[in-house]
């Protein structure tokens, strides 16, 4: 038996016991420490343990909104420690952002050195999902992909190739790599913000923007905060301290959530409505504010369409074309009390149609695409209430009313606190008190999260919330407004990102809408919502009018699916249909990844990507206004490569395949573009100028006014603040808050009316009964006893870190589903039992956790565990269908038009009901 000294034991064990670090020795080197060493005291060991030869910038390039700057320490080519950098510049009179981090981020090294790491290219030899692979060389794997790419273009069409990668803000160089490749070969790319259900569609409908939100330091400026469907102490850990500090500063905080979650236990008041009834609660608050005249009338007149006139005969806006020969259909009227006449206000869409039309751009309208002009009213005093007579162009006299008159009459009749109490379960007295407090505290803020966003009618709910901010005049003020923190969606330097990802311009890129793409190609057309909504009809109309894309064109099936930086299959709603109907259509599935996740498991070729600490990229978020970077602490381990280098290498192999097959060029008639596959590498690298990751990162910075002048060397020194932003200007030492361009500077809102638009006079909105904010109950197509919820976990970022041993040790060691103690007793279920949860869409079999904070009639399974993790069958998405809301298909209505991640159908993983029973059957040896 080999003898080991105490020093040898300490050094060897240090390789695995450093918690948030690793020994500078590799495990292989540690094996050599079994020989005898002369004992010379313990002090030098501790000194050496924290010594390093390299210190670099690091960030965690995952679908996380933290964007937490870190330092990474390495020695002899091994990362030994990671820690928060604590060097974000402070705001004036505001608590610091520093240090930023959470339990997940400090596990980043686990994916470098853990068993999850992909080391070599792999090619499947068994069935998809079976887990049988063989090691391949890079040349073999890339040639296999390149041959299929060229053959698909030649024999089918370039848009039969599909490239998916989400959230560009966290790693824009990596994101741009595959999108630039798709751009030059004619493939289509995917939306993600809407597919995840995170896109605030109601904000786009109301405000004409993809979205915008205050950085979290601005929470401290608020005097009253409502956490509505948001659980920031669990899902926004780096920023939650601003809430506690605001409380200490006198801010009152209210949580509106069905369950008694980790944020609810820390607030001043907890309101717990029935799931999905938040719209009734919001509109009953509006009832109180209007009834008691607590609203800001001037704000409604200037900043909203509530003073615009609506025809009583057609229910449409009164347009200039109705009254004046040759008048515009995009100019509208209000009633001027001072003159007693109808007046067209400044800022309507028709004022400058060439500047108002939404540009053909990635992620829609942002930053430099807003209209010119002003919306100040001058001497005009618009009427909010009343009925007036107007003579039309044909001589006919009709009655018109301001939008506010119509809205008020409905809310007064339909949305009393007493009626809302019966729907929500919240007492009328509590609703009235909440409304008064919110309306009278200045400034007041609503923070909304996924709990309000992932519903079939989430757009109408968000419009109701925006109505509250409009009534109180809190939008565009520090400490106020409606701020949504759902998803990692905001690449502030968007023009630079677009320049790198789509060099010939977004107008020459095929964008598919992922919800529609999945609905069509996974053949979930049998997901009938109810007898009142004909989804297929609206979908056909959207395709016929080209309001929404249907890719591949001409009814073809997708053939090649390249996925990177995203666990697409694991996140997919309609998972049963995806595996049964979509996956067999795909002749090649490629996954580029740092680890073997569920999507990789069901792929044909898996390519190993460099870890976040082995590559150079940028990292930004909507939660603060600073740019981070990550840079190589060590060279990419094993045979991994950065995403940028992988797609450059693939482009070279496509060139070779095209030359081999004699198919170097083809005419893409849609774009009148003769594509040259034999020159792909030069196109990808701009003739070599972008051959390195660092050059690509600097290119992004240089091509956006928000970051021009910022260099990588400056980012190595410390995080740099953006110089400009989207809907407000940047002010030194002041937290960013959105919409000041419109509220303070009086620029027109980028909507059809030039204001926050609450009345949407489009046929589809009339069909659905949602031309104004109304309460719409959850869709209950599945008649089962429990409402299913899939919240985000404290111990993972979506599926990332779900399989980290360090995180599993902090919980039950695997996925589980929560149920109330009363419901569990009724079902005869005990804590940690195996249970079967099912509906018409699928099933999941997992452990159960009895949680006293869970509401009766609801069960919650933490979002997207890996499909191979202690699950007998299915996952959290197995019971979720793909459902399309018809209003999300509207296009060519002013600001409502499809643009990737700007407007389109979203995910509806909350309108789901399930049944549950104790599982009787064989169970694996597990936690």
UniProtKB/Swiss-Prot annotation:
Cofactor entry: [4Fe-4S] cluster; Mo-bis(molybdopterin guanine dinucleotide)
Biotech utility: Has potential use in bioremediation of waste sites contaminated with perchlorate, a common component of solid rocket fuel which is a widespread environmental contaminant in water systems in the United States.
Alphabetized Gene3D superfamilies for the sequence: 3.40.50.12440
Binding site for [4Fe-4S] cluster: 60, 64, 68, 102
EC number: 1.97.1.-
Subcellular location: Periplasm
Cellular component per GO, a single term: periplasmic space
Knockout consequences: Deletion of the pcrA gene abolishes anaerobic growth in both perchlorate and chlorate but not in nitrate, indicating that the pcrABCD genes play a functional role in perchlorate reduction separate from nitrate reduction. Deletion mutant strains are still able to grow aerobically.
PROSITE patterns for the chain: 4FE4S_MOW_BIS_MGD, TAT
Annotated function: Component of the perchlorate reductase that catalyzes the reduction of perchlorate to chlorite and allows anaerobic growth on perchlorate as the sole electron acceptor. Is probably also able to reduce chlorate to chlorite. The alpha subunit is likely the catalytic subunit.
Subunit structure, as described in the record: Heterotrimer of alpha, beta and gamma subunits.
Protein's name in the database: Perchlorate reductase subunit alpha
Gene encoding the protein: pcrA
């Amino acid at each position: 038996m080999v003898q080991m000294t105490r020093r040898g034991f300490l050094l060897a064990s240090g390789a695995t016991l450093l918690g948030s670090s690793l020994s500078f020795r590799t495990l292989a080197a540690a094996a050599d420490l079994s020989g005898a060493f002369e004992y010379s005291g313990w002090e030098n060991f501790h000194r050496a343990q924290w010594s390093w030869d390299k210190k670099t910038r690091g960030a965690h390039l995952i679908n996380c909104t933290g964007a937490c700057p870190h330092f990474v320490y390495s020695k002899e080519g091994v990362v030994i420690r990671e820690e928060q950098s604590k060097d974000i510049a402070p705001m004036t009179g505001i608590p610091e952002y520093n240090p930023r981090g959470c339990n997940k981020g400090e596990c980043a090294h686990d994916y470098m050195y853990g068993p999850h790491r992909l080391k070599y290219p792999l090619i499947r030899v068994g069935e998809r999902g079976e887990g049988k692979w063989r090691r391949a060389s890079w040349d073999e794997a890339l040639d296999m992909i390149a041959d299929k790419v060229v053959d698909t273009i030649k024999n089918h069409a370039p848009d039969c190739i599909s490239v998916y990668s989400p959230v560009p803000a966290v790693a824009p160089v990596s994101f741009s790599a595959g999108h630039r490749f798709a751009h030059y070969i004619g493939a289509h790319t995917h939306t993600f913000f809407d597919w995840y259900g995170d896109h605030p569609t109601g904000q786009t409908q109301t405000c004409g923007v993809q979205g915008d939100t205050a950085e979290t330091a601005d929470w401290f400026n608020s005097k009253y905060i409502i956490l509505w469907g948001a659980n920031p102490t669990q899902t926004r850990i780096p920023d939650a301290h601003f809430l506690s500090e605001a409380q200490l500063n006198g801010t009152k905080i209210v949580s509106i959530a069905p369950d008694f979650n980790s944020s609810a236990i820390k607030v001043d008041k907890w309101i717990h409505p029935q799931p999905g009834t938040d719209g009734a609660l919001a509109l009953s608050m509006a009832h109180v504010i209007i009834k008691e005249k607590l609203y800001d009338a001037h704000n409604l007149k200037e900043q909203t369409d509530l003073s615009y006139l609506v025809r009583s005969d057609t229910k449409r806006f009164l347009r200039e074309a109705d009254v004046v020969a040759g008048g515009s259909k995009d100019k509208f009227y209000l009633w001027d009390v001072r003159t007693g006449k109808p007046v067209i206000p400044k800022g309507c869409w028709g004022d400058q149609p060439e500047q108002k039309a939404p540009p053909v751009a990635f992620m829609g309208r942002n930053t430099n695409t807003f209209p010119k002009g002003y919306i100040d009213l001058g001497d005009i005093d618009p009427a909010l209430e009343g009925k007036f007579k107007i003579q039309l162009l044909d001589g006919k006299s009709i009655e018109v009313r301001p939008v506010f008159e119509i809205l008020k009459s409905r809310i007064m009749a339909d949305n009393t606190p007493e009626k809302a109490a019966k729907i929500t379960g919240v007492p009328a007295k509590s609703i009235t008190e909440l409304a008064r407090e919110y309306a009278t505290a200045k400034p007041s803020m609503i923070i909304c999260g996924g709990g309000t966003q992932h519903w079939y009618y989430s757009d109408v709910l968000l419009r109701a919330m925006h109505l509250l901010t409009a009534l109180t005049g809190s939008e565009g003020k520090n400490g106020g407004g409606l701020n949504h923190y759902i998803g990692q969606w905001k690449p502030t330097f968007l023009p630079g990102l677009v320049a790198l990802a789509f060099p010939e311009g977004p107008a020459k890129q095929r964008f598919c809408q992922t919800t529609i793409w999945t609905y069509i190609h996974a053949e979930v057309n049998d997901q009938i919502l109810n007898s009142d909504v004909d989804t297929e009809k609206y979908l056909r109309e959207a395709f016929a009018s080209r309001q929404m894309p249907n890719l591949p064109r001409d009814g073809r099936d997708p053939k090649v699916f390249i996925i990177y930086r995203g666990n697409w299959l694991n996140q997919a709603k309609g998972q049963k249909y995806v595996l049964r109907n979509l996956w067999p259509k795909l002749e090649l599935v490629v996954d580029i990844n740092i680890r073997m996740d569920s999507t990789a498991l069901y792929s044909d070729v898996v390519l190993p990507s460099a870890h976040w600490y082995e590559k150079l990229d940028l990292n930004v978020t909507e939660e603060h206004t600073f740019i981070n970077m990550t840079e190589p602490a060590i060279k990419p381990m094993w045979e991994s490569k950065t995403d940028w280098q992988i797609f450059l290498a693939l482009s070279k192999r496509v060139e070779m395949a095209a030359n081999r097959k004699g198919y170097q060029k083809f005419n893409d008639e849609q774009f009148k573009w003769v594509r040259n596959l034999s020159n792909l590498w030069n196109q990808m690298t701009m003739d070599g100028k972008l051959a390195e990751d660092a050059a690509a990162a600097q290119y992004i910075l240089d091509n956006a006014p928000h970051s021009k002048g910022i260099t990588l060397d400056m980012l190595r020194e410390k995080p740099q603040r953006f110089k400009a932003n989207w809907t407000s200007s940047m002010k030194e030492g002041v937290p960013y808050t959105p919409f000041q361009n419109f509220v303070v500077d009086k620029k027109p809102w980028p909507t059809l009316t030039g204001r926050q638009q609450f009345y949407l006079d489009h046929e589809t909105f009339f069909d659905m009964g949602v031309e104004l904010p109304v309460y719409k109950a959850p869709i209950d197509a599945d008649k089962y006893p429990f409402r299913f919820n899939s919240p985000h976990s404290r111990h993972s970022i979506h599926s990332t870190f779900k399989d980290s041993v360090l995180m599993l040790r902090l919980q039950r060691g695997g996925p589980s589903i929560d149920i109330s103690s009363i419901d569990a007793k009724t079902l005869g279920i005990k804590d940690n039992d195996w249970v079967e949860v099912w509906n018409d869409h699928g099933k999941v079999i997992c452990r159960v956790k009895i949680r006293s904070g869970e509401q009766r009639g609801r069960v919650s399974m933490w979002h997207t565990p890996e499909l191979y993790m202690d699950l007998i069958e299915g996952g959290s998405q197995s019971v979720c269908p793909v459902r399309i809301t018809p209003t999300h298909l509207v296009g060519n209505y002013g600001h409502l038009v499809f643009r990737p991640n700007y407007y389109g159908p979203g995910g509806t993983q909350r309108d789901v009901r399930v049944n549950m029973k104790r599982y009787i059957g064989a169970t694996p040896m597990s936690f």
